[in-house]
Amino acid sequence: MAKDDSTVRCFQGLLIFGHVIVGMCGIALTAECIFFVSDQHSLYPLLEATNNDDIFGAAWIGMFVGICLFCLSVLAIVGIMKSNRKILLAYFIMMFIVYGFEVASCITAATQRDFFTTNLFLKQMLMRYQNNSPPTNDDEWKNNGVTKTWDRLMLQDHCCGVNGPSDWQKYTSAFRVENNDADYPWPRQCCVMDKLKEPLNLDACKLGVPGYYHSQGCYELISGPMDRHAWGVAWFGFAILCWTFWVLLGTMFYWSRIEY
């Protein structure tokens, strides 16, 4: 293939453009995954306590892949401009490895969405919230994390329990073992607070008088951010894979036509 052929130059330009897009997508993927692993909603302790934080693992992989895509796109552009078979061969080998990692990241993130169920967080809350008798230090760490996260959620987002305050009445829980039902029908954080973060009317809150306690559950506030992040990592990654596949295919064709 002659290097001064106008058709070749046009094809080189298309491949370079394709790799510029790949590099930009890599930067965007890294930024998205950094935002996710920074845990803006501070929900990681709830996932850690389930012993399944694979969605964060998928995001860490996505961050690594994004950086690699940017670097490899630069390498590919250099190889295309120089029509260098060795550079492009090195690019192919590394890109296949990175591509496989991104496939794993997308699959992991997409499948985790079904993991965020109501029963999962309900069981965890009942078992770990204010559980002062953990069997191991690891359980103590997880119990403290779950308790602090739930206290913050209920105060900050004006919700109570997973489905509502009735969760604390219907089911056996560590909270019920530690607290008297008459004094603590549900945690104090379920009460409507004044500016000093004190219950507006504690007795009315205990009796369940509307307007003095939060009747809304917290499930949507937990699963919503997790679902959005899972779909973001999965589907943006999948879109990048689709684009990269065709760019990679075109580059392989170009490589096969370079003269020795």
UniProtKB/Swiss-Prot annotation:
Its main location: membrane. Residues 1-15, 81-86, 251-260 are cytoplasmic. One of its GO terms (cellular component) is apical plasma membrane. Keywords: Glycoprotein, Membrane, Transmembrane, Transmembrane helix. It is a multi-pass membrane protein. Gene3D superfamilies: Tetraspanin (1.10.1450.10). The chain crosses the membrane at residues 16-36, 60-80, 87-107, 230-250. It holds the Pfam family Tetraspanin. Residues 37-59, 108-229 are extracellular. InterPro entries: Tetraspanin/Peripherin (IPR018499), Tetraspanin_EC2_sf (IPR008952). N-glycosylated with high-mannose oligosaccharides. It is found in: Membrane. GO terms for biological process: epithelial cell differentiation; response to bacterium. Bladder epithelium. Belongs to the tetraspanin (TM4SF) family. Heterodimer with uroplakin-3A (UPK3A) or uroplakin-3B (UPK3B). PANTHER family: TESTIS-SPECIFIC EXPRESSED PROTEIN 55, UROPLAKIN-1B. Component of the asymmetric unit membrane (AUM); a highly specialized biomembrane elaborated by terminally differentiated urothelial cells. May play an important role in normal bladder epithelial physiology, possibly in regulating membrane permeability of superficial umbrella cells or in stabilizing the apical membrane through AUM/cytoskeletal interactions. This is Uroplakin-1b. It comes from Mus musculus.
